[in-house]
């Protein structure tokens, strides 16, 4: 099968944008609409902007880009509806990808990945290609590549999370993924679905006790200002599923696809490096900004038994054969 890198490059042919540039790729300019819910600096916005800029450079006057961010056109769920109907051409999708294709539930299996090299090996290989094929069939979307939201950590105001027992009764904000909610219920927490923009105030007012996200989001949204504990769990790795409307993709010329292909690969690499840099730098930024926040490691062995049970339940949702193949690829 094609590697995800090749898939990403091929798919980028569908992602042109509406800002005039220099360097023609085709006689007729390609018009594209790009949008993201998040604000500048967030991982999904960073990836979409990197794609926009790379495509401009590649296509010049051959592309016109209409670009929106900061939720101008709605939240991620609305964006998914718009890209499927053709109102948008290219968007990044975070945890909500599972709402379009149950195979994406595998990403909610705890401790599936241990490092970024392992992630790249799986997503840039046959399993990434399988997810692309499934997304085309089930959602009408072409995956151009997989970027990074990152490894998620737990923050809260109740106690340090060291073992699953420490999660008991903790009101934890999660994304809308049913499998993420199920996972934390099985771990003993009380997960609450909530829009990310509401989290700070909800923590401040005690509506929720905490949340789980990579350092990039913790720092960007300043949640450390209203949290006492950050537990370095790295319990789940969340990719960015970078997609284009399939009909739009299929309408591209070979030259346009090649340009999109190159720009998407640039965006994938930029996104992954951005995530790695955030992990390397932002813990220290948070420590200096919020010296009263307590950091701790978890006892990962104590989570493993429950993680196996969660994996078995998620396998029923994602498909047992597919889940087995994915787990095998992740443990090579």
Where do the protein language model's features map onto the residues?
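Signature of the catalytic double-stranded beta-helix
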Residues: 122-132
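N-terminal secretory/targeting leader peptides
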Residues: 10-12, 28-118, 127, 136-332
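Sec/Tat signal peptide C-region and signal peptidase I cleavage site
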Residues: 21-27
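Short, solvent-exposed secondary-structure boundary motifs
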Residues: 17, 131-136
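Bacterial N-terminal signal peptides
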Residues: 10-20
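Bacterial N-terminal signal peptides that target proteins for export
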Residues: 1-11
């Amino acid at each position: 099968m094609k590697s995800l890198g090749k898939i990403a490059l091929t798919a980028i042919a569908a992602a042109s944008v509406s800002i005039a540039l220099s360097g023609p790729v085709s006689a007729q300019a390609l018009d594209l609409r790009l949008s993201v819910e998040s604000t500048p600096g967030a991982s999904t916005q960073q990836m979409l902007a990197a794609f926009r800029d790379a495509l401009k450079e590649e296509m010049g006057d051959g592309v016109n880009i209409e670009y929106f961010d900061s939720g101008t056109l709605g939240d991620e769920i609305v964006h998914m509806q718009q890209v499927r109907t053709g109102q948008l051409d290219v968007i990044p999708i975070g945890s909500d990808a599972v709402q379009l294709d149950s195979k994406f539930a595998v990403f909610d299996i705890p401790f599936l990945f241990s490092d970024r090299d392992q992630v790249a090996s799986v997503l840039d290989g046959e399993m990434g290609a399988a997810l692309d094929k499934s997304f085309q069939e089930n959602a009408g979307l072409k995956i151009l590549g997989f970027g990074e939201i990152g490894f998620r950590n737990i923050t809260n105001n109740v106690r340090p999370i060291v073992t699953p027992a420490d999660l008991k009764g903790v009101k934890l904000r999660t994304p809308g993924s049913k499998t993420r909610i199920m996972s934390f219920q099985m771990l003993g927490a009380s997960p609450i679905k909530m829009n990310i923009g509401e989290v700070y105030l909800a923590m401040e007012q005690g509506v929720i006790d905490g949340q789980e996200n990579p350092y990039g989001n913790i720092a960007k949204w300043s949640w450390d200002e209203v949290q006492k504990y950050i537990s370095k769990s790295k319990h789940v790795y969340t990719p960015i599923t970078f997609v284009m409307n399939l009909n739009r993709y299929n309408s591209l010329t070979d030259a346009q696809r090649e340009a999109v292909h190159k720009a998407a690969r640039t965006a994938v690499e930029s996104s992954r490096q951005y995530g790695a840099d955030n992990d390397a730098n932002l813990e220290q930024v948070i420590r200096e900004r919020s010296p009263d926040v307590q950091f701790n490691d978890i006892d990962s062995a104590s989570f493993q038994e429950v993680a196996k049970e969660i994996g078995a339940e998620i396998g029923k949702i994602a498909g047992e054969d597919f889940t087995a193949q994915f787990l095998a690829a992740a443990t090579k």
